[in-house]
Design a protein with these regions (language model features):
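Membrane-embedded alpha-helices of multi-pass membrane proteins, especially ion channels
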Residues: 35-38, 138-139
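The first (N-terminal) embedded transmembrane alpha-helix
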Residues: 24-34
Length: 297
């Protein structure tokens, strides 16, 4: 039987996801170059903010693509748990990039409010409309893959790019109707707030995994109850639960069981491991046993 940790690469449908990442990168990068050029020509901060976000998305797609490649490598003597956390690190880096981008949008928008600049509303609206179609198409590619944290960070990137394009379209229309360029900055600030909130959630979740916190969705006390549900288990301590990747959780603990022979103790451990997989979604368990007769009086 294969050791699951030694085959972490089997977790992802790599071929399909790799193709999605490649397609998304080419389409997004092409549109980003076009949007930057029009943003500079039109003087629109909303377009430049959206183009900057698109640029970060291209970088994000590239990071995730290579993280995916690394994560598929089999475990070895130096990396016994495999390389699954490469994807978590990718999510963390992507989240930080987005946080910094949101802060930069605030800085530029406030500067434009203090010192307004001419904005060509019709160009802004036209490019933004194309951006909505491009970003929505790419976001939909990853909609069903969000259970992977690194893909969720990519989906958030693309979703907010689509939202930013909607904002840029609205800004362009308002500028055409009112001749007031302040709408460009105000909508940029709103986009920045929404982006900051979502990107910080990705950073927080990735940091939690990297610091080996108990994975979200798993209650350590309930896991302990699952172990103690075996009538022969008398005590559980030194319980550790952590995520190796978005989809792979590990556990180690020490249990005290009633005095029994080696064969019976192995059956107890196998049963506990099976229950942990079924009830708590914990794939890899290391359980140290101690017999009651070994305990000091």
């Amino acid at each position: 039987m294969k050791d699951k940790i030694g085959y972490m690469g089997d977790i992802w449908n790599s071929s399909s996801l790799d193709n999605k990442l490649k397609f998304g990168f080419v389409l997004n990068t092409g549109f980003t170059i076009f949007e930057f050029a029009v943003g500079i020509f039109s003087g629109s901060l909303a377009l430049l903010s959206d183009a900057g976000h698109n640029l970060s998305d291209s970088l994000s797609l590239l990071i995730v693509f290579f993280a995916q490649k690394i994560a598929k490598q089999e475990a070895n003597i130096d990396h016994s748990y495999g390389y699954g956390r490469a994807t978590i690190l990718a999510a963390f880096v992507n989240g930080l990039i987005l946080v910094l981008l949101a802060l930069y949008i605030f800085y530029e928008a406030l500067g434009r409010i203090i010192q307004p600049e001419h904005v060509a509303g019709s160009l802004v609206a036209g490019v933004a409309f194309v951006g909505i179609m491009v970003n929505t198409s790419i976001a939909l590619l990853f909609r069903k893959d969000q259970d992977n944290m690194h893909i969720r960070s990519t989906y958030i990137n693309m979703f907010f790019d689509a939202l930013a394009s909607v904002g840029a379209l609205l800004a362009g229309l308002l500028i055409i109707l009112t001749k007031q360029t302040i709408f460009d900055s105000l909508i940029s600030i709103l986009i920045g707030i929404l982006l900051l909130r979502s990107s910080w959630e990705v950073v927080r979740d990735a940091m939690h995994v990297l610091l080996e916190g108990v994975p979200s969705g798993i209650d350590a006390e309930k896991v302990k109850e699952v172990i103690l549900s075996n009538s022969l288990v008398k005590h559980v301590d030194d319980l550790h639960i952590w995520a190796i990747s978005s989809r792979y959780t590990a556990l180690s603990c020490h249990i005290v069981i009633e005095d029994c022979d080696v064969e019976e103790s192995e059956k107890i451990i196998d049963k506990i491991k099976e229950e942990l997989r079924e009830k708590s979604n914990i794939e890899h368990s290391t359980i140290e046993i101690e017999l009651t007769e070994c305990l000091p009086d």
